[in-house]
Amino acid sequence: GAGAGIPSHTHLNKLDEDKLLGLGDQKFSLVYYLSVGDQSCSEPGVLKFYEPDEELLPEEGMVVIFPAGRKHSAVYGGEKKRVIVGINFYAL
């Protein structure tokens, strides 16, 4: 809803970080944007990636797949509802 946001984070857990198993390199995150909400506001829900820094302004119907270990964040300050589907998966 309005004012929603997620501070910078990754989607790796302790098991993913076990170097012996090596699962972290095979884990990915997917975001599917069903509704991007109000992008005319000051915080339009930009998906920010870190190291290297990149910004992506989502569009309805867009699918973004990235390594689960990549630090990212998103802040949305619009009044309209924003609807996304987020999934983490392993490519084994």
Go through the PLM ranges and name each one:
Residues 1-76, 81-84, 88-92:
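Catalytic core of non-heme Fe(II) oxygenases with the double-stranded beta-helix
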